[in-house]
From Swiss-Prot:
Keyword Thylakoid: no
Catalytic reaction annotation: 5-oxo-L-proline + ATP + 2 H2O = L-glutamate + ADP + phosphate + H(+)
Gene Ontology molecular function terms on file: 5-oxoprolinase (ATP-hydrolyzing) activity; ATP binding
SUPFAM superfamilies documented for this protein: Glycoside hydrolase/deacetylase (SSF88713)
Lineage, opening ranks: Bacteria, Bacillati, Bacillota, Clostridia, Eubacteriales
Protein name per UniProt: 5-oxoprolinase subunit A
Domain of life per record: Bacteria
Role played: Catalyzes the cleavage of 5-oxoproline to form L-glutamate coupled to the hydrolysis of ATP to ADP and inorganic phosphate.
Length: 255
């Protein structure tokens, strides 16, 4: 039996600005990563996204990012491990309070954007994130790029981790994601192609990188980005395609 968690980054609007169609996307995913105010999101949006996630029985996770509203958390900022630790704890705490106020349970933490990419390769930053998560609640599951330093540091400290793969992104030979600065080479828009790649990741633990070689990959959770106009169509079709191939879509259960 093949199974996968389907996660999406949500609550990424700000004030009067709306990003994506969260209410509809929640019908097709099993885990939501909710922005916590640094790269996107605000108290009202956080509260509403938590409420909608609970209504749809979707696992709730904090999605902490760098303090970069103008750049959507995707610009490089020089920060120390101590600063990263504080930012992560602060943002987790903010979302944790909303989840608790609605009678829910927080499930996981997944860093956003540049913070996620830095933690994939930088052991010290990865350790700061893992320690921040563990010290808030050691029961939280840490989502990170498959094969990354973040997964290694999460495992080292004693967190349960979930290795994440991407349906709409391409990979490099070292297992990292192709930078968005590469333009079209970084993004997969063909839904059938994306679904076939994901199925291969789940079944065989392999993905073809941009250098035309197979690399090993572990797929516990699949990310669908929610910040573009076609996200709803993409997630709906990926969900159906995987189910048609016999893959169970289900949230990761705490052990």
């Amino acid at each position: 039996m093949y199974k996968i968690d389907l996660n999406c980054d949500l609550g990424e609007g700000f004030g009067v600005y709306k990003m994506g169609n969260d209410e509809e996307i929640l019908k097709y995913i099993t885990s939501a990563n909710i922005a916590c105010g640094f790269h996107a999101g605000d108290p009202k949006i956080m509260h509403e996204t938590v409420r909608l996630s609970l209504l749809n029985d979707v696992a709730i996770g904090a999605h902490p990012g760098l303090p970069d509203l103008a750049g959507f958390g995707r610009r490089n900022i020089n920060v120390s491990p101590d600063e990263i630790y504080d930012m992560v704890v602060y943002q987790i705490g903010a979302l944790y309070a909303f989840v608790k106020s609605e009678g829910g349970v927080m499930h996981h933490v997944k860093p956003h954007g540049t913070l996620y990419n830095m933690a994939a390769k930088n052991k010290k930053l990865a350790r700061a994130i893992a320690e921040g998560v563990y010290n808030v609640n050691p029961e939280f599951i840490l989502f990170g790029l498959s094969g990354s330093e973040l997964i290694s540091e999460g495992n080292r400290i004693g967190l349960r981790t979930a290795s994440e793969v991407f349906a709409d992104r391409t990979y490099q030979l070292d297992g990292s994601l192709t930078p968005r600065s590469a333009g079209n080479a970084a993004i997969i828009t063909d839904i059938d192609k994306a679904a076939e790649r994901v199925y291969r990741m789940i079944k065989y633990g392999l993905v073809m990188c941009e250098q035309k070689k197979d690399i090993g990959i572990k797929a516990d959770t699949l990310c669908i980005h929610g910040d573009n106009p076609h996200s709803l169509i993409f997630v709906r079709k990926i969900n159906k395609h995987l189910k048609d191939l016999g893959v169970y879509i289900e949230k990761i259960i705490h052990e």
